[in-house]
Amino acid sequence: MDIITFGWVAVAAFFALSIAFVVWGRNGM
């Protein structure tokens, strides 16, 4: 895997995880 591709995948995963965490936090709390 290319380093640039890995970077984009990491950014996309972090972005999706942060959104999921915020939504889960609002629904949970």
UniProtKB/Swiss-Prot annotation:
The chain crosses the membrane at residues 3-23. It holds the Pfam family PetN. GO terms for molecular function: electron transporter, transferring electrons within cytochrome b6/f complex of photosystem II activity. GO terms for biological process: cytochrome complex assembly; photosynthesis. The keyword Thylakoid applies. One of its GO terms (cellular component) is plasma membrane-derived thylakoid membrane. InterPro entries: Cytochr_b6-f_cplx_su8_sf, Cytochrome_b6-f_cplx_su8. The keyword Transmembrane applies. It is found in: Cellular thylakoid membrane. It is a single-pass membrane protein. Keywords: Electron transport, Membrane, Photosynthesis, Thylakoid, Transmembrane, Transmembrane helix, Transport. It comes from the Bacteria. Its main location: membrane. The 4 large subunits of the cytochrome b6-f complex are cytochrome b6, subunit IV (17 kDa polypeptide, PetD), cytochrome f and the Rieske protein, while the 4 small subunits are PetG, PetL, PetM and PetN. The complex functions as a dimer. Component of the cytochrome b6-f complex, which mediates electron transfer between photosystem II (PSII) and photosystem I (PSI), cyclic electron flow around PSI, and state transitions. Belongs to the PetN family. This is Cytochrome b6-f complex subunit 8. It comes from Synechococcus sp. (strain JA-3-3Ab). The gene is petN.
